């Protein structure tokens, strides 16, 4: 796969079935109509949908009043698609906080936010190829980010502090090293978390087993004490009966009362 091959075919922000702003690849004529049909046929009671067919992934996230939809190449990692939706969501929230688009969002029309979100789509779609320079931002192009990482060795968290900056472009190879590093860190964290869970499970299993043994021992001891108390009561009753029988024999001088 070449570094300038496009992996993002389409992306949009919608309210209901109204497309507020969108990005569509010029190499995919008619993809806007396909995307609109997908949004119109979203099944009810779903907040997240992802479907891969013909080497393309159709993903949609519904967050409150807005829907975020994208058509991606199937090789795009899940973490990258999540970043895409988070970037679109943060851009929409910024516009809502600004208040300048309140009327447009109350009664939305097609592409009413297109001009305001074009820079965001340009940032997301930047791939660093010469034929796509018109889509690149000065601070959002993969080349500038690669240079910045090489010179300053900045972490991903510090990059998040720059509002509007590209954290992890979906396309191209300039951030391949960063993506591999992040994947290794994620795998290491997952392995550590899994080991921790196994340790917790082992300790918890031992605790449950010890608890069952202790409970069984307690029941056995309680049963033994109950039996002992029953025998004591029976023996006490027997002693009383024998004493009363002896008194009766003494008064009657044997069995003369019965004979009389």
UniProtKB/Swiss-Prot annotation:
Residue ranges occupied by any Longin domain in the UniProt entry: 12-114
Regions crossing the membrane: 231-251
UniProt entry tagged with the keyword Transmembrane helix: yes
Record's subcellular location: Membrane
Keywords in alphabetical order: Membrane, Protein transport, Transmembrane, Transmembrane helix, Transport
GO biological process: protein transport
Top-rank lineage group of the source organism: Eukaryota
Assigned protein family: Belongs to the synaptobrevin family.
Name of the protein: Phytolongin Phyl2.1
């Amino acid at each position: 796969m070449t570094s300038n091959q496009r992996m993002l075919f389409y992306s949009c922000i919608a309210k209901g079935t109204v497309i507020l702003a969108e990005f569509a690849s010029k190499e995919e004529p008619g993809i806007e109509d396909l995307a609109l049909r997908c949004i119109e046929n979203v099944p009810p009671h779903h907040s997240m949908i992802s479907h891969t067919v013909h080497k393309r992934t159709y993903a949609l996230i519904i967050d409150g009043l807005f829907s975020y939809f994208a058509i991606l190449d199937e090789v795009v990692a899940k973490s990258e698609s999540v970043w895409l939706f988070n970037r679109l969501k943060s851009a929409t929230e910024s516009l809502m906080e600004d208040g300048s688009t309140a009327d447009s969002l109350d009664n939305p029309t097609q592409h009413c936010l297109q001009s305001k979100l074009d820079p965001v789509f340009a940032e997301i779609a930047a791939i660093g190829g010469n034929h796509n320079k018109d889509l690149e931002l000065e601070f959002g192009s993969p080349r500038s980010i690669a240079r910045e990482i090489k010179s300053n060795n900045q972490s991903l968290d510090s990059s998040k502090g720059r509002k509007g900056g590209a954290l992890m472009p979906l396309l191209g190879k300039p951030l391949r090293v960063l993506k591999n590093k992040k994947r290794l860190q994620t795998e290491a964290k997952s392995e550590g978390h899994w080991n921790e869970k196994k340790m917790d499970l082992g300790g918890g299993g031992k605790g449950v087993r010890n608890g069952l043994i202790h409970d069984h021992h307690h029941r056995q001891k309680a049963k033994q004490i109950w039996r002992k108390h029953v025998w004591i009561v029976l023996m006490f009753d027997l002693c009383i009966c024998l004493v009363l029988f002896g008194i009766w024999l003494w008064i009657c001088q044997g069995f003369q009362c019965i004979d009389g």
